[in-house]
């Protein structure tokens, strides 16, 4: 029984590990987005539209300023908001910033993991076929870091629309078949990718057309993740059922062992009814003392006196005692 349980456990763990590795290998690390007004990917009136799938990762980076870069450092607080806030470019006091770009000497990065369930209490969770919005109401200066309305969201359309689990072709985009990327660059953007720092000049020989070649088949990623979740749930339910059956079996065996009859030495009724005689009792018969067996004194049945009827007929022990002559006998004449 124990060997069989061990083999079942090993089989379930092996299936879970294989499925986890398969799901991880299918996930995509999206190219990072540099949050700066120099990023030409933020289109006027539209912002940046992405089509991530469940399992993908996305980095939002506030680039640092050093001697090799051009321009000044821009201060931002980046928030995830609802559609109404994104349309009006406003935030609420209870909104928590995803990014606080206030350190010019280092890159500040926030990684978004597109997952339906987060192991972290404060982690982000996403649902398929739902839109999510990221904006910043700061104006780029240190004094306007804590603005709660307007800012670059309104003046430079620095906002991100993330259509999780959706296909770009179904949204009316015919120029890009990659569901995890927004449509191709508009004319006049000089081929600059959204993953390139706005402070670095683009390489004339580089091209972003090859990025979509390695991401074919991502439209079925959602179904594969759903299949993985279903198989994992089935394995967990199967393990719970096995554990429940084992516990019930142990309880049944313990109860059956507890109520099993004790093998005690009993005397027949004929032995109890026949008095025993001894050769040196001087003609007198021995006194037969019948003592009931008090199983309550035994360590095996401490509750015998309460449920003694459950153990069958009472058992008696006969103890022989030598006759005793009376010490003082008085006769009335």
Curated annotation (Swiss-Prot):
InterPro entries per record: Cupredoxin (IPR008972), Ephrin (IPR031328), Ephrin-B_Ecto (IPR034255), Ephrin_CS (IPR019765), Ephrin_RBD (IPR001799)
Modified residue annotations for Phosphoserine: 260
GO molecular function: ephrin receptor binding; virus receptor activity
Compositionally skewed regions (Polar residues) per UniProt: 190-213
Motif (PDZ-binding): 331-333
Sequence similarity: Belongs to the ephrin family.
Protein name, UniProt field: Ephrin-B2
Source organism of this protein record: Homo sapiens
